[in-house]
């Protein structure tokens, strides 16, 4: 029987909130200049604005730094990408599953992972969540997955991410991201990021 860390619930959430209350950035969210997530510990940031990521605005033909916001939802973490007008471009919810003990006969490698839920891309007209009032930003879904991957590394889940894709988005996850069906449950609907695809994902569009 696997033992799951309590960090995806009360303990971890309160630790990050307490840390953030003593953080200079948390007390001063209006710091000057672009704050990319490249070298930032995302998990240690409190709720609210945490930094920027670079996206290509296909509609306008420009590169834009969009804002990243974070909040907690019943022990899970939610991240939002918003443009400078405050419109939401995309969002994602993450659940951290850190296993301290697991069956080595079933799992050849550490099964700890970040479970991705409710990944929504509002800027892409080819997704069911498209908001026609929003400009089309290239790489929105990829940036959200990179945040999930970063949180997996920070939480010592060895970069593993897992999700259950919608039927219309499976080709995106398999062909572009390189995800595969969970080999420990081949009859299930979950997909994982295999080891050889972790670094390529982290470098897409120049990385976070």
Question: Where are each of the predicted segments found?
Answer:
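N-terminal chloroplast transit peptides
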Residues: 1-6
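Non-catalytic substrate-recognition and accessory regions of acyl/acetyltransferase enzymes
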Residues: 7-143, 147-164, 168-208
